[in-house]
Amino acid sequence: MVSISKSLVADICVGSSPPTVRFVTLLENHDISNTTFPSLSGVLAQYGSSLQGPAGLQHVGLAQDQKYQHALTKGLKAVEKLQHFLDGPAPMSGDPVVLRCSSARSSTLLEITDETITSGPPCAGAAREREGITSFHRMKFHLPKHVGCVQDVHETSSQMLHLSCDGLRSEDTLFDRFGRWSRDHVTIVSGMCLFSDKIMRDAVQGDGKLDVSKLSSQEPTLYELEIIARSSSAIADVASHILGKNGAAKPIPLEIVLDAPSWHYFQVVHGNLASGHCTPAEALDWLQAVELRCEQVTTVFENSVRHEMGLRGVPAGFYHILAAPGTAGVGTSIRQALTSGMVPDIADCMDAICEVEGERWAMFYSLIPEKDRPCDFRSLGNLFYIYEVVRPALAAKNGSTAAELEVSGPNSALDDSSSSGHSDILDSALHLKANVERPLIMSIDDRAERKIYSKAQAFIKKIRRAPQIPSHPLLLELYSARRVFINGNTGGDSLYWNDSSPHPLRMNTTAGSPELEAFGVIRNLYGNDCAQNLQRWFSEAGVNVSGHT
């Protein structure tokens, strides 16, 4: 099991030559009764339920004290809702059937500890300013000793998580006192990027020519390794917790969707192709290198999730893992155009989506105002990230045609401005629907991707109010605490935009100081087993790891 019980984080100094890395412990000294002071700008690590006055915030400025306190209180209330939602209510009678169901559902329990990391933008204009101030609370998952046929199971695992969900009410639970599920199926969605920003930029030369070798021979980047290690553990904890509640009731269907971009990156080279700086054949080679990396990374991601699920005693047959199921049509359309020596057209891609995705896409597209519909590959790629999140909520049951859905348009009952957040209106809309599906969607991702899920949340609200869509979904946004910071977090930058891979890091700038490659950083953060497994899985997927031992 990937262990993140120790709050060890890496701080990479990219401004030094060569880049260096240090490891900072945030929440490990339990002798401290209230607050610790990590040397990371805008980051407050603490024990206890409240901040201990302005003295504890000297590293972010006294003016931030009230904002941090508010974020901590709001975050705690949110995870308390999550705890109640996942663990459910106590039995209300002495009926043996009720007690038996309750006992089965109590096989996994969720505990909120008093360890918290509250982080915010270190200064005005910082990269993370749009994320606001966020509190991550350590949640301990108490797992059953025996699940299915596997007996050697770790009993506890913990995650530093933040929950965002306007639609989750304090009284909501995943199942009632009689063991009946309140949701029809569960989908856990998680995503990641490919390579790093630097590598993607280096693959396009200054004159617009493409250098495919920068992609095809690339070793795993620290970003890719870290996001897989962090996300896999969180996915497995949440999924095994839910599946552990099956008990005597009918098991709830659970899918895990792993969304890594492929054709989404075509927007990087589309302009070069259209202006004649590269040929369709060169663009095709470039795209195929990206698609191969997507396939390889997704395979490793899936292996990591399955490994973590196995450590928690969950048999493979209890869940399904899908790789971005809604994206196939676009990639095929782009490749066909390039193979024919043509510049791909977004209209052809839209036709391909309609053909492959059918009513799901028609329902989704009907919710988009005309002015917000995609007009180029960049906007289409951004839209598809959102579509993959809400896709599980778009299963049609009432036989509505695409034309009927389009007529309704994104207005009237779908307008967020007048009724956002009013559960009575949502419930009224639900009452008008027939054969309603009640899917639960849980996203698990880095906080830097919040924009995607915030927009997906807006679509979820529209779906719940749309009488023509037979679905009443709930989206819970879970974010895991960052484990790698850049330059002491002085700019709030993320690893993807500052990853120096494949170049190794050094422990200090002294000549001859020890080098630490990407797998070494993972070994320090997540343990030797995690690093070895990732190295083996990447090698089996065909990614070069020859430079690592």
UniProtKB/Swiss-Prot annotation:
Keywords: Ligase
Pathway the protein acts in: Secondary metabolite biosynthesis
Superkingdom of origin: Eukaryota
Protein EC: 6.3.2.-
Motif Conserved DDXXE motif: chain residues: 445-449
Domain notes: The conserved DDXXE motif is essential for catalytic activity.
Family: Belongs to the arginine-containing cyclodipeptide synthase family.
Protein name, per record: Arginine-containing cyclodipeptide synthase amaA
Organism this protein belongs to: Apiospora montagnei (Sphaeria apiospora)
